[in-house]
Amino acid sequence: VERSVADAPSTLNFILPEAFLGEEDEERIAAIRENMYAALENDALSKLTRGFVFTERTTRTGTRRGIVAAIDLEAYSSEAGVSAPIRSSEEVVPERLAPRIAERKNAPLEFPHAILFYRDKKDRAVKMLLREELEKLYDFDLMEGGGHVTGWFVPEDLAAETAQLLHAKGEPVFAVADGNHSVAAAKAHWESVRATLKKEELANHPARFMLAELVNLYDASVVFYPIHRLLKEVDAEAFCDFFMKNVRCRREGTVLIPSLPAGAEGVKKTDELCERFVRENGGTIDYVHGAKELARRAAEEDCAGVQLAAMDKEDFFPALKGGVNLPKKTFSLGEAKEKRYYLEGREISYD
């Protein structure tokens, strides 16, 4: 990606890629901050008035439509057992937050990639926006086989009308589909800023909000894929015997297909057994996308796999009720190139 971008203007200059976390973070974050201030000073960014961005992204699974808007971090929680209008969908690991919090500290801008689900079976919000004559902001092919993306500006009055259609009954109203640690880091940063503010400054401070893409869970392009478990550096026969003593399975070579419920319950049971075996016998656990890839890697020496079923999207919101977090790696929304690219940004400080 760096070779492709070279010296061209790119949001790559404003982000800390996950692949680089833990590698010279301070130097990278300082460079990101400098790039942001330079872009602001040189008028390299197009500033919009208040509103939303309506996006249409074409990938191999179809066309995904989303609404890019600022969410109120006061309404968000990742704490277990805490009900909130905006919920994390999996447990947040504190150690993974530090570099992301540091990235936001003293930064004038954010360029997030988080996707949040909402529920709208009739797709009223998207259908309303499709009927409008909106100003087109961008329309181009994405790099690295990411498909095509188009964005339109939704002015403030229409944005307010659209927002009313996004609120389904019951909590959570929104749940993080991708970017759990990014949203949690934004909340942690806001809490540190909030502690320094006067009461009258709390309601509208830019750090209180975070930009995210809101996607209808019932969009036809939203597909939940399972994430399989791969055991490495283990006695494959011993692992298979151990797992099959605890769960009824079909066995295909060194791949086990357990008779467990799809989704959180099956993942939790699988993880408990895999972690117990590794704790008692050594080895490591890896996460693999695709049944064929799992079979290929499980056939390698000292490896074994557990093939899981895909979570039903209808079970997603009910599983989070009451502040419950899903086990890590419960589902995937597809390959890396199908995830959200970094496009829109927002000011998060008054500097």
What spans do the regions from the language model cover?
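Surface-exposed, charge/polar-rich loops and edge strands
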Residues: V1-D351
